Amino acid sequence: MLPRLVTRPMSAKVLALSVGGASFIVFSGAIPVQASSGPALRPVGAAPAVPAGARALGPGRASERLTFDLVLRPRTGRRLRAFAAAVSTPGSAAYRHFLSTAQFAARFGQPRAVVASVDAALRGVGLAPGPVSANHLVIPVATTVGRARVILRTGFERYRLASGRLALANTSAPRLPAAVAHLTQAVLGLDNMTVAAPAATRRPRDRRQASPAARAVPAVIGPQPCRAAVRAARRYRAWTYNQLARAYSLTGRAAQGREGAGVTVGLFEQQPWRASDITEFQACYGTGVPISTVKVDGGAGRGPGPTAETVLDIETVIALAPRAALDVYEAPAGNFAKSSLDEYTRIVDDDQAQVLSTSYGVCESLVKLGAPGLIASENTVFEQAAAEGMSVFAASGDTGSEACEQSSKRLKELSVQDPASQPFVTGVGGTDLTAIGPAPAERVWNDARFGGGAGGGGISSVWRMPSWQAGPGVVNRYSSGRPCHHARGYCREVPDISASANPERGYAIVYKGHWIGEGGTSAAAPLCAALLTDIISGLSPAARAGFLNPLLYSLPKGTLNDIRKGNNDYTRTHHGRYPATRWFDLASGLGSPIATSLAEALRRPS
């Protein structure tokens, strides 16, 4: 559904915006501020929408510290997009000829002279820019609310949100010197209205037990659990990781016995975690995966709330790729737009990880309203990731075809989640794995009856269907160009692939010293990342697979498990949209992975 603008009698030129039955407040026009002499100023972006139920508390305190990002446009955006696609497409002359971060900056980042001129212009109006990012595209700027009010010509308002959280937001688009505005893609971090939700879901009415002492059990196949994990799996009807490995054919043949050796996995996190949980889990599985923690913008802090998200991601990769290295990146959840971009930028600029998994996201329409400019800025970073050969997996969300419902129960319109819908990201949906083999028995995960969640999937309202998204089932009776305003074609469809996600048959993990069962597409995404890690470690030598989707959509029949049962209409308000069908569908994508088949495809010369 497209946003519907309606006017209401409010002060200071305020518009009420209605999206899918929920209201947001948008300030139109800047609150008058002190005028200052200097260069001509131009607006960049827009003010964030304020969710209905938020209560204004008055102007932001002038002394409050504020740090925002000035995001520069890539030097040649179209060429970057073309290169990112070519380097990822089998048969292309550029296939797998990846760049380093320095090469990317030299080719697609802004030149040093341009960055220096932007720095000088910002200092000239009284701002304090920091060092540009390694890709030459992000400049952090430190100031105060009072100075930003005057320099950027925007008001700042404090709010108490319906959740009780305090927030700050600019009330109009920031204004920058014209020469700087021309080079700027977005200004991120002037507000903290939006918080990303991790797509981790616990088994309803879950009960925890104290962790018994870890003891080894005889090896069967893949990573081997201790008795504590086996007992927990039985109690919570959860899978142990050796069972998951078997379900997706993650055997010695797929990984050539290397189990992730020589490969680094990056994890995007915004939740705190306890090292003692990981120590206990590694003792159970007999692993010794080295973990490096990289704090971005000060680290995760307390996070938006207690969840098992980070340990779920870490333990999944540890168990399924036990000889890989693991880099856990952490950023605070409070300033969603800035923290997310800073963290993705740091991961890709560091260029240490060959594979990246993220389980965080927000539905596209709420990102567009609450964090204007973030989706486009993320896209540039994911194009950079593809150019550097980094494979990115993102959870598609746990509220089925109604992604916005994860943020508000009132938002039941058809929607998908960012960043899973990004055109240079592999979106991972959810299945209900009921038997492990020899061929796994799976259907689309949808626990609508008991409110346990459903695998995210549907049609993007932002992105057009990429050229690589083609093949049987891709253009179907639900395909449309309307959501993304594409009059002559179709919009991007997600997910791309799926894996076990039902928390009723979740993953047995250690969290806060207890064994629990955890699921969601937050489990499926790191599972797929670990699976690819094992596969590329078995290549000779260990290599980067790069952005995986062009290869995935070109694979022949039988390379993935085709999911043909169920639908992801989580709220039961869309007549079963979207159902699983033969071939690709909007509930499970291309299906779930078969590691041995994918390994063979990646070993073929192109």
List where the protein language model places each region.
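Secretory targeting and sorting signals
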Residues: M1-A35
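An often Trp-containing, charged/polar helix-loop segment at the C-terminal end
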Residues: R8, R482-H486, I536-L586, S606
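Substrate-binding/charge-relay-adjacent region of secreted/lumenal peptidase catalytic domains
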Residues: S36-P131, P140, V145-G427, A454, ...
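A generic structural signal for beta-strand entry/edge sites
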Residues: H136-V138
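Acidic/polar loop patches that form or flank catalytic/metal-binding clefts of enzymes
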Residues: I291-S292, F393, G427-G430, A435-E442, ...
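Short, surface-exposed amphipathic charged segments that create phosphate/polyanion-binding patches used
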Residues: P306-E309, Y344-T345, P440-D447, G576
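Short, surface-exposed polybasic-and-hydrophobic patches located at secondary-structure transitions
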Residues: A439-S461
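Walker A/P-loop NTP-binding active-site region of P-loop NTPases
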Residues: L531
